[in-house]
Amino acid sequence: MTIFQGRATRKPSGGKLRPNHSKRRYELGREPTLTRLGDRELRKIRSYGGNSKFALLRCDYANVYNPKDKTTRKVKINTVKENSADPHYVQRNIMNRGTVISTELGDARITSRPGQDGVINAVLL
């Protein structure tokens, strides 16, 4: 079943809204890409205007920026420590923007959107 991101058909009062147009392709959404910890796996998605996005399904490395040294290194991710989006994501090792991960260098917060960017960028805490 598809995800429709257009206007609802009912008003807050319960009255019916008349549609201005039928459903259009640009109003379609998709299921969220829940990036998990594991061997790297990408999926290419066609986006608006014929462009493409890369959804990261699984990954075990992150580009971690160290603000003290002002250097970036590719390091291995150990586990997911904290996720403000959903506490159950920690148990399932799901990573998204704002997730705190444990790496070889220490704890880091993810700054990219892995489900849409195709990479995991993070900043050391």
UniProtKB/Swiss-Prot annotation:
Entries under InterPro entries matching the protein: Ribosomal_eS8, Ribosomal_eS8_CS, Ribosomal_protein_eS8_arc, Ribosomal_Se8/biogenesis_NSA2
Keywords, comma-separated and alphabetical: Ribonucleoprotein, Ribosomal protein
CDD domains with a match to the protein in the record: Ribosomal_S8e
Record's keyword annotation contains DNA-binding: no
GO molecular-function term, one example from the UniProt record: structural constituent of ribosome
Assigned GO CC terms: ribonucleoprotein complex; ribosome
NCBIfam families with a match to the protein in the record: eS8
Subunit: Part of the 30S ribosomal subunit.
UniProt family annotation: Belongs to the eukaryotic ribosomal protein eS8 family.
Name of the protein this chain belongs to: Small ribosomal subunit protein eS8
Origin species: Picrophilus torridus (strain ATCC 700027 / DSM 9790 / JCM 10055 / NBRC 100828 / KAW 2/3)
Gene: rps8e
